[in-house]
């Protein structure tokens, strides 16, 4: 896995880079694990825009990803595939009982290796265990927040969390964002780091490539008319005329805290994530 840099053959290739696909072993997805999902393009059931800057993009086929893992059944890695819906790769597993499943591809997991999700599973990349069975300092991903709910944390490309303490019915985990929080020891996690670690190091290079991803242009409020945005209007390049920037609906933006003041997980968070 590496990054390929383009020369300035055209303005669109200047400063552009793409990921190489030499880790992909299969081109077409497993048909039984795919489905089509209607893309709302940011509109609600009345056709009104409820989420701005969405629409267009290349048509995608969704893959069914198993975040819970079949317990106590060994599985063999059949292939490593591309998934257009996420920035990491996915691995196709063939279980001993004939079931096929997709999982997030951990770094270092190759085709032909056997992995298992079990309380007694060995400590190797791709195996899934309860948090209380994992030694301190181990890198983990696909972490559950509630037992049996399926992995919800550390699932992006290159993400890895670290188990740093165990006490009582909780374990302490340092997440990729820098946040340190408590998680029930009965929750499961997968050993290792998510693959495709260079996904965040590419340069988009041109506006059209962002449109392929289904993202539409973002227009500054200060260049709009007063009817469209609180920052709009004025003669020439006018200031926003307010003490703080606001959203199109008048709420304080750019630095305003949006987290609920009394959220259930406040007592579980030891240290908040790093600020941008």
UniProtKB/Swiss-Prot annotation:
Region spans: Disordered: 225-256
Q: Which InterPro entries match?
A: NA-bd_OB-fold, Rib_uL2_dom2, Ribosomal_uL2, Ribosomal_uL2_bac/org-type, Ribosomal_uL2_C, Ribosomal_uL2_CS, Ribosomal_uL2_dom3, Ribosomal_uL2_RNA-bd_dom
Q: What is its main location?
A: plastid
From the Swiss-Prot or TrEMBL record, state where the protein is found. Answer: Plastid, Chloroplast
Which keywords appear in this protein's UniProt record, sorted alphabetically? Chloroplast, Plastid, Ribonucleoprotein, Ribosomal protein
Q: Got a GO cellular component term for this one? A: chloroplast
Q: Which GO terms describe its molecular function?
A: rRNA binding; structural constituent of ribosome; transferase activity
Instruction: Cite a single GO BP annotation.
Output: mitochondrial translation
The cross-references to SMART domains, in alphabetical order and at most eight, read: Ribosomal_L2 (SM01383), Ribosomal_L2_C (SM01382)
HAMAP family per record? Ribosomal_uL2_B
Please describe the quaternary structure of this protein. Answer: Part of the 50S ribosomal subunit.
Please give the family membership noted in the entry. Answer: Belongs to the universal ribosomal protein uL2 family.
Could you identify this protein by its name? Large ribosomal subunit protein uL2c
